[in-house]
Amino acid sequence: MRSLRKKREKPRPEQWKGLPGPPRAPEPEDVAVPGGVDLLTLPQLCFPGGVCVATEPKEDCVHFLVLTDVCGNRTYGVVAQYYRPLHDEYCFYNGKTHRECPGCFVPFAVCVVSRFPYYNSLKDCLSCLLALLKPCKDFEVDSHIKDFAAKLSLIPSPPPGPLHLVFNMKSLQIVLPARADPESPILDLDLHLPLLCFRPEKVLQILTCILTEQRIVFFSSDWALLTLVTECFMAYLYPLQWQHPFVPILSDQMLDFVMAPTSFLMGCHLDHFEEVSKEADGLVLINIDHGSITYSKSTDDNVDIPDVPLLAAQTFIQRVQSLQLHHELHAAHLLSSTDLKEGRAHRRSWQQKLNCQIQQTTLQLLVSIFRDVKNHLNYEHRVFNSEEFLKTRAPGDHQFYKQVLDTYMFHSFLKARLNRRMDAFAQMDLDTQSEEDRINGMLLSPRRPTVEKRASRKSSHLHVTHRRMVVSMPNLQDIAMPELAPRNSSLRLTDTAGCRGSSAVLNVTPKSPYTFKIPEIHFPLESKCVQAYHAHFVSMLSEAMCFLAPDNSLLLARYLYLRGLVYLMQGQLLNALLDFQNLYKTDIRIFPTDLVKRTVESMSAPEWEGAEQAPELMRLISEILDKPHEASKLDDHVKKFKLPKKHMQLGDFMKRVQESGIVKDASIIHRLFEALTVGQEKQIDPETFKDFYNCWKETEAEAQEVSLPWLVMEHLDKNECVCKLSSSVKTNLGVGKIAMTQKRLFLLTEGRPGYLEISTFRNIEEVRRTTTTFLLRRIPTLKIRVASKKEVFEANLKTECDLWHLMVKEMWAGKKLADDHKDPHYVQQALTNVLLMDAVVGTLQSPGAIYAASKLSYFDKMSNEMPMTLPETTLETLKHKINPSAGEAFPQAVDVLLYTPGHLDPAEKVEDAHPKLWCALSEGKVTVFNASSWTIHQHSFKVGTAKVNCMVMADQNQVWVGSEDSVIYIINVHSMSCNKQLTAHCSSVTDLIVQDGQEAPSNVYSCSMDGMVLVWNVSTLQVTSRFQLPRGGLTSIRLHGGRLWCCTGNSIMVMKMNGSLHQELKIEENFKDTSTSFLAFQLLPEEEQLWAACAGRSEVYIWSLKDLAQPPQRVPLEDCSEINCMIRVKKQVWVGSRGLGQGTPKGKIYVIDAERKTVEKELVAHMDTVRTLCSAEDRYVLSGSGREEGKVAIWKGE
């Protein structure tokens, strides 16, 4: 074995591979091999079957290693073996000295160790090296290997993304593939290998063994297959990761490893199969060569490997069968390539597409198995309710889930879900989520199946039944031997005509990656040549950047990353840091935080002086050095939900209810606490909580099990769900069960099941509880009078009457409130109240239970205590209300609103091309709604952790968000991700604007509280102009007449684009009270007017642009206590404020006619201050309120 040397004359080339350490030359010992590699073990792994001298030359071969250190960090080895004839001057034959021993060939091994699993690439490199070594003399071997190692060590590892690196290695062109994203593994192997070795059913069984963390041993007569096949299975399960010992190749001397008592995944030569099977207990033995799975002898009678959930397994098998796994069939119609490079490129392209299809297929399997996990997570308290999750699984799948849920793999998976990591699993879950699931994810009501869900269940049940009749699902534990080798089966595509649709493999065509060819390295051991190579590398990267389209930030980021690395190798630390800093505005996901931190720590005094000349760079440096303190505070624990064992005060009770997943809203939980503690000490004992929890879950389970005939479902809307069923009662419509949905009451008739509508909640006129006499007994009766029917509905509900009376009145009041306020969220809240009433009555089961439940009758009491009807003008103008805080414990203030029109962009899915409403909530949270249906489009994502001050659509592909933390975050509207940040401001970003009337603006203007104004080029994200105002307090800016109008509180300054002051409107010149300040302003160019609002004033002031020195006109706003925002909509100015509405403080909007300068309308629909306003194409106006309400109202524009 010749590739490892203790002494090296040159600086560490391996630094490229792992990017470890600062750019200074490390200690000599660190240069030889990557840290963590055991040099004593490596030789036996290079010859895992032992060293054997051969009598004739053997075929060259390669195998692959995975080396794990004590901390779990992996390095990867590719070993090439070849044989050379033995040359020895002291070899005697027939009593004479001979230079060569006849028929004696000695094995040699060359091992390349890398921090990354470049299996195919390094195999190609070693193939080229062996072509040099085999014919050369012994004394030439070392020089060739040194040259080879030095050259490899100068090749950088490509950053995550679409850019692959290409370099020449003698006769072959080598491609180093990049990982798809920073979270994904590097894939430089053929993912279809296991599918050639095992039938799909066996693949599923092996995946189950890995998911349940068994003790697994792979066997093969081919050492190379052991690593490649096991690594493929690891890739199949991404983002779930194997957490236990992973040793794909055990040498003959390491066989005792299989006696380890913990979970592991190892690989042995097939020669040791019988030995391992007899000696070790409790092992899963996987024979790659035969495509079979067996178990070590002592466990044959006690196999406990569960089956994958049936529907997911069937879908996976059908998709695998539809894959084209054989390149020969794909290329049968093609001419033979006469160019080696072209032939390899074609094969690589085919493999890339197949790998992508396999990844999609296995990822869909994982999503179908684990998608519903998120429904049983509490993110605030980091709790997973495993028991409730299991109850939602089919009985036949319980064994599978019970075993998987207890594994380290699943625990790590849960952490990622609770951290809201947007990995491949989360992205596919989002992409394949139905509209119904998106909507339901935001509702407060507990899980109840909708009519649409019930219908899909029935159809899927019929489909499964049909599948069972057509083809019996094989028992995945069935390991009957002998088996036909899968390689002998048909090579043609399986006919999947009967299982198309969701079962067919996705027709994924991956985008062709970009490639960058690394310059030639002629003499890698000569320092001058290495310096020339680095200089040439930088020059080529700089040239490539010049030819990029301005908006191609994806590729620009990769070039910047690579150039930064080369600068580091040259010792140009400041240039490297500047390139890395530019990743913030091109693609922050690939920013190498650890590398930059080590670089900063190694900077010399002159380099620090240079860095201090660049304020933006110094800010980056300070952020990097401070990050470890933030990371240490990260809480990543996961708790399983457990019932409490101690008495609970309100705070602890609220936490427990939220953890249970019953309800999150703090105000509702407070009322629930009052209900459960009526007439007793204000604390809840564990038994009461347990009874309440069980009662709630039982009614939830009953609702899941309600069987509705098709005839009944046809009368209901697709999003309706049956939330409560009475017992069988006598009514004036017949005998049956009264059913309640969120929209109506109906009678589910007995005998032949049928549907008789009682009433929708909207049409109810009166609900009364009375009694009726029957056989001298007075029976409690519920009477409901309906607007469109003469006959009053009567139901003899007996003991259920009081509860149903409460529930129907609450739903009726909730529906009336929803209609009056045009806010469907009230219906969801009323439904939650109703179901909690039901659970409270079931829990207490006492004479006072109804009174206790009445504490939850929130909307009914509200309607009785005060009229809730909105003013007529408000009702005429209000179109709809939405709640961005739905699903949160407390309402959150709506800080900023932005409407973006819909575009049919090729990069966007058709269903996502609708207009959108962006709502910025507290702490950098942004929620996006579909502005055509006002349903949730994207659950909240974060842009920093500070308050958002402003948003603007810079072009059709990106939304810019200005934050209190001085950063401008750029959101990609297609991926809904924030991969770019602009950090040129040093204080809070207060406004962002573009030129009015431009569909594709070329510039964005930003300003910050310290008075800095920047002009950004949208394509390049470079600052093209900047100026500093003479004073701070800058809150907003407007463009007009080639001037920039700036509101600084004390004045409104008109600035020329060169930064010089053109004109100024000072507040002290217009008001005697100098304690006031400008809050907001608008320019009306057609009227040549400036409209402004001032702190503490209930008036809007209007100046003429022709002469700002003239006193302003005033528009008084009646009952206004403070103004917060204003916007111009056509010939109106809308002013958002806080004022008196119906005698109480509320959010108010004043609509002022810009020509007559009079208030046309006063709109009152918010319970808290109107904090923000935005216009939707001048057809609608949207308003957002403060944290007491946290809702958005949609108003009809004039």
UniProtKB/Swiss-Prot annotation:
| UniProt region (Linker), positions on chain | 438-888
Say which domain of life the source belongs to: Eukaryota
InterPro entries from the UniProt entry? cDENN_dom, dDENN_dom, DENN_C, DENN_Domain_GEFs, Tripartite_DENN, uDENN_dom, WD40/YVTN_repeat-like_dom_sf, WD40_repeat_dom_sf
Residue ranges annotated for the dDENN domain, each copy included: 320-424
Q: Which GO terms describe its cellular component?
A: cytoplasmic vesicle; cytosol
GO MF terms here are: guanyl-nucleotide exchange factor activity
Q: Which UniProt keywords apply?
A: Cytoplasm, Guanine-nucleotide releasing factor, Phosphoprotein, Repeat, WD repeat
Modification Phosphotyrosine occurs at: 858
Q: Where is the cDENN domain?
A: 186-318
The record's listing under Gene3D superfamilies reads: 3.30.450.200, 3.40.50.11500, YVTN repeat-like/Quinoprotein amine dehydrogenase
Ranges occupied by WD repeats: 893-931, 937-973, 977-1018, 1022-1059, 1065-1105, 1110-1152, 1158-1197
One GO BP: protein catabolic process
Residues annotated as domain uDENN: 1-163
* Bias-annotated ranges (Basic residues): 1-10
Stretches the record annotates as Disordered: 1-28
Q: Tell me where it resides.
A: Cytoplasm
Principal cellular location given in the protein's record: cytoplasm
Provide an example Pfam family for this protein: WD40
Which residues are reported to carry the modification Phosphoserine?
472, 490
Subunit note? Forms oligomers. Interacts with 6 of the 7 known isoforms of 14-3-3 proteins.
| Domain remark in the UniProt entry | Inactive DENND3 is found in a closed conformation, in which the linker region interacts with the DENN domain. Phosphorylation of Tyr-858 in the linker region intereferes with this interaction leading to an open conformation and enhances the GEF activity of the protein towards RAB12.
Q: What does this protein do?
A: Guanine nucleotide exchange factor (GEF) activating RAB12. Promotes the exchange of GDP to GTP, converting inactive GDP-bound RAB12 into its active GTP-bound form. Regulates autophagy in response to starvation through RAB12 activation. Starvation leads to ULK1/2-dependent phosphorylation of Ser-472 and Ser-490, which in turn allows recruitment of 14-3-3 adapter proteins and leads to up-regulation of GEF activity towards RAB12.
Full protein name: DENN domain-containing protein 3
Q: Which gene encodes it?
A: DENND3
